[in-house]
Design a protein with these regions (language model features):
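Polyanion-binding surfaces on beta-sheet-dominated domains and ring/shell assemblies
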Residues: 2-383
Length: 383
């Protein structure tokens, strides 16, 4: 029996085998170190998805997919997908609890013709437009004409099972969507009003004198004055198909795309039946005239692990990550959102959880949000 001679390599016994395991296992065992390793790569800071810290995921939009709604859209950003359906319901003024006070407020609002007749009025047209939008938003808010609702209990992620009451995240997202709908002054009240049609003019009867003609004309003039009889209430349902970060941004884009797709029937108040009727012709339907297209950009601050495991020190440092995915959101304590509108105007800023993002960093995020708005506006126009 032959005996195998010992190895002539002196380092064979002393060289330990390297311990290797998949990247997914590394991410689960030490997620912070895993993300730090990517951001401190010699090739430059790259996230596990291959994006740079300031790079957002491109969205895709498909509108008009739901036939039972007045407007719908499906939006996907990375692995996050949202379906938005908008349906209008008629709210009669008889069902408004405080309708008389709302009417008095409307009477106190000067019209455009009245405001221009003031001899010493120095208000510019832009300021008048802003005031009118604020008044429209106040009326929409008082009547509760915009009713958003977000549903995460669709199995979109392991954290949101299709059982139980709405989660805290779903309620928070609904509140943020509702707040931005009003603070951005997105809709005009004129698009939601339903007026009474004036009665057809009757043939004048022969009149014997001027007094009789004047008595017959006055009631006709009063009857011919149009009145607001009802409003459109928009019920906005947002369902998450899948969720992997940037829930607010994706939900808001789906809402904007669905609003662009809305076509409300031509509704009017019929004096004979004292009810609101809708035209069956699709050619008579109308779109919503949006005042602006506010676009959000969410971000988070990641504190990396440096030498010795000290967070925020050494080689790790701090990184501002925009459009975070689900893995990155779990590692960022300081988060926020910047919303910009037409002309780069800052509509809203939300931030909490830390003090890394100061004025300089926020200015850079606003510029990134302006660039993202141009991208999203192009996607909405194509969709």
């Amino acid at each position: 029996m032959a005996i195998k001679p010992p190895s002539t390599n002196p380092n064979a016994a002393s060289t330990p085998q390297a311990l290797t395991f998949p990247a997914q296992t590394f991410a689960k065992l030490s997620p912070s170190a895993y993300l730090t390793a990517h951001l401190t790569s010699p090739r430059g800071p790259l996230r596990p998805s291959g994006r740079k810290p300031s790079e957002a995921r491109p969205p895709t939009v498909h509108t008009g997919s739901l036939t039972h709604t007045h407007g719908s859209a499906v939006v996907r950003c990375g692995d996050t997908a949202v379906v938005c359906g908008i349906r209008g319901e008629i709210l009669k003024v008889e069902d408004v609890a405080d309708w008389e006070s709302i009417c008095r407020q409307r009477e106190n609002i000067p019209t455009g013709s009245e405001s221009t007749t003031e001899p010493h009025d120095t208000t510019t047209e832009e300021e008048k437009k802003r005031q009118r939008r604020k008044q429209d938003t106040a009326e929409i808010s008082n009547l509760h004409l915009l009713v958003p609702n977000i549903d995460l209990a669709t199995g979109c992620s392991p954290a949101h099972l299709p059982t139980g009451p709405p989660s805290l995240q779903a309620q928070t997202l609904t509140h943020r969507i509702h707040t931005l709908l009003h603070t951005s002054h997105l809709l005009n009240i004129d698009d939601l009003q339903i007026w009474s049609l004036p009665p057809p003019p009757s043939s004048p009867a022969p009149q014997s004198g001027m007094d009789e003609a004047q008595e017959d004309t006055e009631p006709l003039e009063k009857m011919a004055e149009p009145e607001i009889k009802a409003y459109w209430t928009l019920y906005i349902d947002l369902l998450f198909i899948s969720l992997s970060g940037s829930a607010f941004d994706t939900a808001w884009l789906a809402l904007l795309a669905a609003l662009h797709n809305v076509r409300l029937p031509n509704a009017y108040h019929d004096t004979d039946t004292s009810s609101v009727l809708c035209s069956p012709l699709t050619s008579d339907s109308k779109n919503l005239n949006l005042n602006d297209i506010p676009i959000p950009l969410s971000f988070g601050v990641f504190h990396g692990e440096g030498e010795g495991g000290a967070k925020g020190e050494g080689k790790g440092g701090k990184w501002i990550l925009v459009d975070m995915d689900g893995f990155e959101e779990g590692l960022c304590k300081e988060v926020g959102t910047v919303v910009v509108g037409e002309g780069g105007r800052v509509v809203r800023v939300e931030k909490g959880g830390g003090g890394v993002v100061g004025g300089k960093e926020m200015g850079g995020l606003v510029e990134k949000a302006r660039g993202r708005r141009e991208e999203w506006v192009g996607v909405l126009e194509k969709g």
